[in-house]
């Protein structure tokens, strides 16, 4: 027994020592202690331009000398190059890959905005189709523009009562993929990008999303923006819904001989009847293990939720085809977006942050969750606070249809219920996010944030909506900081209570009107109105919604193509039947996502939303001029260049059939069997061997009511004489 204890002791020490290693930080620290002569760049190196100054010595007093002793541009002498790492920096990235469960990890010193652009440029070529959450960070939109992608925007479910979006339902994703398949464009679909978790804490079932998408498009690449989710790897419940853990689990399942056997048995049991799209959308699909490729990327803002200096981020890769297909393009994209003068302090902090979570991450994240739950309890159980504000529950932010577990408050009903919800529900809520509904205070979210929390008490938050503010606990949150926040909220509520009691009748009426607007009136969030036909792709057997953002973006570089119109002027032109097309991104804060992108047509819903939003910060909108839009002449010019008629359609290429050449109706008609279009074979329509031609669905889990579907139901049996009918409904 003593021998066993000794082996255990030595194993633990070995594991701790391996995790404690910080190759780049240690190399930088050692380098900083060497005497050097700088005959190159960086006068600030070792603080020499500061300590010898008459006027800026206080910089050393504030920051300390060590940070300047470690400031260097050297890439040798024990250090390394971020662009071509071969030494300690390479080792640090390998250790990060082990800690985060990836096959490759890369450090980024300009935030996840740059990380997203690197991954997008590495994977997407001009003309590739990308499925993108419209409610994503602006870096994705700009990345699509730089890559020349044709973007299909995915709609998240709206939360109109709180003027925010949730997440993109799996049904929405599948419907877009199936539409692209029908149009014969599935071979051009390259990537899908989603945000997990969302800013407001809504978490996807990552493995299921990838599983069902790969059943339709077996080589689809996934980019998961985990800017706010880096910490999730280090908690056993959270981890199951991270990109890297889900990629590994899916890969192992696809390689499991039992899975392959069950898949083959299910194929043999399929019928030849082809299911409708509605059937496919309602059923759980699984991929063919012989064809599916697990290709997953995650970008994380380490500095947002873990220990790192600002702008410290990471790219994690789990891609079966990385070495064959992506390594070289990724290197070029990394070179294109990475500075040749990276900040070594940021890189060292990423190394140290990895050490911390590798050794104590589980403890820190558990404490983070506990602090969040204490904050929820303190707010909701305080009689005065609950009068003016409340923490939104899972049932407030995730509609019932996405919660098969039917647990309305899994965060408060015990660990077993929380795990059940995380195992079954399409979306779950991150316990460390607290969305505080403040409508009864009469304050809108932005005013509450600035005038009350930040200006008066120094409470820092970021995300607000029309009637809510978001609090997030992190691994640095302490119990005393939670207690201070509760005290601040109580002070605000107490002052408000007193002010209301002393209001005149007129003031009271004004206050009640403000409360009514914030609590009873909802602000309808507009759907994506669509790209103008001049920027759409018109190939394929039927219309699909993807648009060329890059072409629309660069058209505005010639200012003669643009003009400014006010909302009222746009209304008048819409009344006259004229399409008005945005020349730029229009992004109000809050909510912080582009309401308009280049090439998108204005709608009345968008204009009304912008009028009702009541926010002073709108990027892409100039109050004195209005919206920057394309002139009618510019749109006509682009339309003519791609062969569109004035009404936005391509001229028909069909020749009128001679009157004497009447034919009998084709046997295989449209949806109702009565069409008389000419027959078109499968290979003529979408080409042979299209990805996704062999879809299948697994038998659902025992606790699921989702029916089965397999290959033959999904694409139909290859019966002699079968032909695919062209659809001209669009």
Give the role of each language-model region.
Residues 1-81, 90, 98, 243-273, ...:
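Non-catalytic terminal extensions of PLP-dependent enzymes
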Residues 78-89, 105-109, 195, 199, ...:
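Short acidic-aromatic active-site loops that bind/stabilize oxyanions
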Residues 97-119:
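Short loop-beta-helix segment that forms the pyridoxal 5′-phosphate
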Residues 106, 152-154, 462:
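General small-molecule cofactor/ligand-binding pocket signal
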Residues 111-114, 160-161, 193-194, 468-470, ...:
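Short amphipathic alpha-helical segments embedded in low-complexity Lys/Glu-rich regions
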Residues 115-125, 129-380:
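Conserved PLP-enzyme active-site core in the AAT-like
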Residues 682, 698, 702, 711, ...:
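Intrinsically disordered, low-complexity tandem-repeat regions
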Residues 683-684, 689, 693, 707, ...:
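Conserved positions within tandem-repeat grammars
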């Amino acid at each position: 027994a003593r021998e066993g204890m000794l082996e255990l002791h030595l194993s633990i020490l070995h594991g701790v020592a391996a995790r404690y290693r910080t190759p780049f930080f240690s190399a930088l620290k050692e380098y900083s202690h060497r005497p050097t002569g700088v005959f190159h760049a960086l006068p600030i190196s070792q603080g020499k331009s500061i300590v010898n100054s008459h006027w800026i010595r206080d910089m050393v007093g504030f920051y300390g000398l060590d940070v300047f002793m470690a400031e260097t541009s050297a890439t040798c002498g024990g250090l390394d190059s971020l662009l071509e790492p071969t030494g300690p920096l390479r080792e640090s990235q390998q250790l990060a890959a082990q800690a985060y469960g990836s096959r490759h990890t890369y450090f980024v010193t300009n935030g996840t905005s740059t990380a997203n652009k690197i991954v997008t440029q590495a994977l997407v070529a001009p003309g590739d189709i990308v499925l993108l959450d419209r409610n994503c960070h602006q870096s994705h939109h700009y990345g699509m523009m730089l890559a020349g992608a044709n973007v299909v925007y995915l709609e998240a479910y709206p939360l109109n009562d709180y003027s925010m979006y949730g997440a993109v339902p799996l049904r929405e994703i599948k419907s877009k993929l199936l539409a692209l398949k029908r149009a014969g464009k599935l071979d051009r679909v390259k990537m899908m990008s989603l945000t997990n978790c969302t800013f407001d804490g809504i978490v996807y079932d990552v493995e299921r999303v990838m599983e069902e998408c790969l059943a339709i498009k077996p080589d689809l690449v996934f980019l998961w923006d985990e800017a706010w989710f880096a910490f999730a790897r280090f908690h056993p419940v959270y981890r199951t819904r991270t990109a890297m853990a889900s990629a590994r689990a899916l890969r192992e399942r696809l390689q499991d001989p039992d899975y392959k056997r069950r898949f083959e048995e299910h194929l043999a049991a399929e019928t030849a009847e082809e299911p409708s799209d509605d059937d496919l959308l309602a059923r759980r699909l699984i991929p063919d293990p012989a064809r599916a490729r697990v290709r997953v990327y995650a970008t994380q803002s380490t500095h947002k939720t873990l220990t790192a200096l600002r702008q410290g981020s990471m790219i994690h890769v789990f891609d079966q085809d990385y070495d064959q297909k992506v390594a070289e393009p990724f290197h070029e994209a990394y070179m294109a977006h990475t500075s040749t003068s990276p900040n070594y302090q940021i890189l060292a902090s990423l190394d140290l942050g990895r050490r911390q979570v590798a050794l104590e991450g589980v403890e820190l994240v558990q404490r983070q969750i506990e602090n969040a739950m204490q904050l929820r309890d303190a707010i909701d159980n305080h009689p005065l606070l609950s009068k003016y504000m409340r923490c939104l529950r899972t049932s407030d932010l995730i509609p019932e249809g996405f919660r098969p577990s039917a647990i309305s408050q899994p965060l408060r009903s015990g660990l077993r219920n929380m795990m059940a919800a995380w195992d079954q529900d399409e979306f779950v809520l991150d316990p460390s996010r607290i969305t505080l509904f403040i409508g009864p205070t009469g304050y809108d979210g932005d005013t509450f944030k600035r005038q009350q929390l930040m200006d008066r008490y120094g409470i820092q938050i970021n995300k607000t909506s029309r009637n809510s503010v978001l609090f997030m606990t992190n691994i640095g949150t302490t119990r005393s900081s939670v207690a201070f926040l509760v005290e601040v909220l109580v002070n605000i509520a107490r002052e408000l209570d007193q002010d209301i009691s002393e209001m005149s009748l007129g003031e009271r009426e004004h206050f009640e009107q403000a409360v009514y607007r914030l609590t009873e009136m909802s602000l309808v969030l507009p759907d994506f109105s669509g790209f103008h036909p001049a920027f759409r792709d018109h190939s394929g057997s039927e219309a699909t919604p993807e648009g060329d953002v890059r072409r629309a973006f660069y058209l505005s570089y010639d200012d003669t193509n643009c003009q400014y119109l006010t909302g009222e002027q746009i209304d008048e032109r819409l009344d006259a039947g004229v399409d008005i097309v945005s020349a730029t991104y229009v992004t109000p804060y809050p909510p912080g996502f582009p309401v308009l992108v280049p090439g998108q047509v204005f709608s009345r819903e968008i204009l009304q939303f912008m009028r009702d939003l009541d926010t002073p910060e709108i990027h892409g909108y100039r109050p004195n001029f209005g919206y920057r839009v394309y002139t009618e002449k510019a749109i006509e010019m682009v339309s003519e260049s791609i062969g569109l008629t004035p009404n936005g359609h391509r001229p028909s290429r069909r020749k009128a059939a001679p009157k004497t050449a009447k034919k009998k109706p084709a046997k295989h008609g449209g949806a109702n069997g009565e069409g008389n279009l000419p027959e078109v074979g499968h290979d003529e329509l979408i080409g042979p061997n299209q990805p996704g031609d062999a879809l299948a669905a697994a038998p659902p889990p025992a606790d699921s009511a989702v029916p089965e579907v397999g290959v033959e139901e999904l694409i139909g049996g290859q019966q002699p004489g079968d032909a695919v009918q062209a659809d001209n409904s669009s």
